[in-house]
Amino acid sequence: MSLTTEQKKEILAQYGLHETDTGSPEAQVAMLTKRIVDLTEHLKTHKHDHHSRRGLLLLVGRRRRLLKYVAKVDVARYRSLIERLGLRR
C-alpha cells in the first residue's frame, strides 16, 4: 500500500519542482494519486476490506483539497497537473 523509496523518487523527479521537492502541491497530489491507484487495485480483489476502503476515501478527500488549492492559486498549473496525471477524463 505504501510507496517505496524508489517509487517516491521517480514520482518526485517527474512532478516535483526540483529533485528533493516533497512539499509542493503537485508532488503531493502525484504521490497521493499513486497511492489511490494502488489501493483501488487492492480493493478490486479484496472487496470486503472496509478498513482500507475508508483509508482510500480519506486519500481521495485529501487529494481533492490539494487540487482545489492548486486551482485557486494557479489555474494553469492545475490544468497541467490534471492532464499529466490523467484525472478528470
Curated annotation (Swiss-Prot):
It comes from the Bacteria. One of its GO terms (biological process) is translation. SMART domains: Ribosomal_S15 (SM01387). GO terms for cellular component: cytosolic small ribosomal subunit. Gene3D superfamilies: 6.10.250.3130, S15/NS1, RNA-binding. Keywords: Ribonucleoprotein, Ribosomal protein, RNA-binding, rRNA-binding. One of the primary rRNA binding proteins, it binds directly to 16S rRNA where it helps nucleate assembly of the platform of the 30S subunit by binding and bridging several RNA helices of the 16S rRNA. Forms an intersubunit bridge (bridge B4) with the 23S rRNA of the 50S subunit in the ribosome. This is Small ribosomal subunit protein uS15. The lineage of its organism: Bacteria, Bacillati, Actinomycetota, Actinomycetes, Mycobacteriales.
